[in-house]
Regions:
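Rossmann-like adenosine-cofactor binding region
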Residues: 117-190
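Short helix-loop-beta connector
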Residues: 39, 62-68, 161-163
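Phosphate/diphosphate ligand-binding glycine-rich loop within oxidoreductases
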Residues: 1-60
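Glycine-rich adenosine-cofactor-binding loop
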Residues: 47-50, 66-87, 97, 102
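Adenosine-phosphate binding glycine-rich loop
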Residues: 166, 170-227
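Conserved S-adenosyl-L-methionine
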Residues: 87-92, 185-189
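NAD(P)-binding Rossmann-fold cofactor-contacting core
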Residues: 90-116
Length: 227
């Protein structure tokens, strides 16, 4: 293994873990790694998806400690995000997922309840979901709105959002989803998924090289690639 490090994605995020010498706490909880660092032949695995998400919140002045958070979706992105939110001191996490045999909400809830100190619950996503009053942060961790279905918006009640809530999308393509456009039209504070993508990539580069990359250049490259 002569590379300084690599990124990996599905289906290798889980399979590669057995070959690593050390795995970060969050990656162990998530059950997947997306980056590997080679230090003198010792392989270290981490998951920077959730960390990139947290950096996106921080860049908007959002501190998750003590906050009540609703996560739309229970897949891989939701798992990484929920673990980082729990480790950062979120007060309450509500996982909203479709009921059925493929529902990953219960297994994610079990991880949060047994391996972190966060208060958490699941809600079945049946029909139009209403965001509970008192929610601080809403996260769209679904793929609804991802290219090419650029006009789609997750089925939740936009009127249940208030101006003191913050909404974070995880979809990077398009860089401004139909959901983000509608939220901005309504005056709801929000952030696109591009920040999460750029931040996790920047973290990976820094882990491999010890240098912080210019994220402005990375944003520009992403916009050009998706234009």
């Amino acid at each position: 293994f002569k590379m300084r490090g690599i990124n990996c994605t599905i289906p290798h995020k889980i399979a590669v873990m057995q070959y690593l010498d050390e795995i970060s706490e969050s990656a162990q909880l998530i059950g997947a790694v997306n980056t590997i660092v080679n230090t003198d032949g010792r392989l270290y695995g981490d998951n920077t998806d959730g960390k990139g998400f947290m950096m996106s919140l921080e860049s908007n002045g959002i501190d998750v400690k003590g906050k009540r958070i609703v996560i739309l979706g229970a897949g891989g992105a939701a798992r990484a995000i929920c673990v980082e939110l729990a480790l950062a001191g979120a007060a309450h996490i509500t996982i909203v997922s479709r009921p059925g045999p493929k529902n990953l909400g219960p297994s994610l809830l079990e991880i949060l309840q047994t391996r972190t100190s966060v208060d958490a619950e699941t809600n079945d996503w049946v029909g139009t979901y209403k965001i509970p009053a008192g929610t601080d942060i809403v996260v769209n961790a679904t793929s609804v709105g991802l290219y090419p279905s650029v006009d789609a918006i997750p089925n939740f009640d936009l009127d249940s959002l208030t101006r003191d809530m913050f909404v974070q999308d995880v979809i990077p393509n398009p860089t401004e989803t139909a959901l983000i456009k509608e939220l901005r039209r309504r005056g709801i504070r929000c952030e696109t998924g591009a920040g999460m993508l750029i931040n996790q990539a920047a973290l990976n580069i820094e882990m491999w090289t010890g240098r912080k990359p210019d994220k402005t250049v990375m944003y520009r490259a992403l916009e050009e690639a998706l234009a």
